[in-house]
């Protein structure tokens, strides 16, 4: 089973992000951008990859430990950007301007408990909107169009919501893209 742990987002935030995505697609139409389906928008706390089903109870136990002492809290989704940078954009994302510290706290606890060798990379809470296929034709032109299109959303607010749970998700890869299924939720 291909698994990850996520903070899911409400429909209002999803709809605001989808409206921005539609504007971006018109401004930077390019087959080199692989857009994430709006129903798959989420904030990844930890990607676990392929896991044996027998490990599910330990994963849920780690989720419960990671959220211990964390009450429901506000998450604000604001601005667009790219990873790793505008010279080599691979991922187009919407950022988290509020709630990132608590998301990071839970992500770090999950990583310490569930990964044999924690990555040591800093946690950057975000919602992936698109991935850039590499290599792509006219990469410089695409970067310019994408930069120009996202600049107007640099500080845009896509909504705030109260995060009340974290979810264990299964990702099934299909020719039409990933299909996500919620396996378990742990309340904050």
Sequence positions of predicted segments:
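Histidine-dependent nucleotide/RNA phosphoesterase domain, centered on the 2H-phosphoesterase fold
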Residues: 1-188
